[in-house]
Amino acid sequence: QRIVQKLGLQVHSFTHRTRKYSSYRGSVGTVADNLLNRRFKTSIPHQKITTDTSEFKYWLQGDDGKPVAHKLYFDPYMDLFHAEIVSFHIGQTPSAVGIQSALEEAIRVTADCPYRRTFHSDQGWAYQMKSYTKRLKEERIFQSMSRKGNCLDNSVMENFFGLLKQEIYYGRVYHSYEEL
């Protein structure tokens, strides 16, 4: 650290400090128990699935010629067997419809699992909604949620977002939804 300071060097890819997107809106529906309890490993494909939402910004030119920030929301579903994204939705607003459509695709892709599946998320409002929890019950899928404010309970997904942003997002400026 001191050598870096003496030489006047600065690491740009770790210096971004912006407010992290939070989908938590209090208790708006059913909060499930933390069934995974940080046991992320599985030897069975499609048995344990985790999800979360992350926010990305892109910049468009405003009427006055100044850049205006716009947001994009990424909702992936990851199979914990080999850390593969099995479905996702990208939208300009955090929407239950987008999360629900990615959920439907994740249910379809993981339907070949011979054991009862577990879908894990944080306590975001979309994951507490009646339509979300009802859909999981219809498919006999266990719902698991992280404890409030504890990112370690979904650390695999948080790590994925960190790596993704490190590789393609931080240090770059995107000028359209399509470019990002």
What is each residue range found by the language model?
Residues 82-88, 143-146, 170-171:
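Short small-residue beta-strand/loop micro-motif enriched in glycine and branched aliphatics
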Residues 114-118:
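Catalytic core of bacterial c-di-GMP phosphodiesterases, primarily the EAL and HD-GYP domains
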Residues 1-44, 150:
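Basic, flexible linker segments flanking DNA-binding modules
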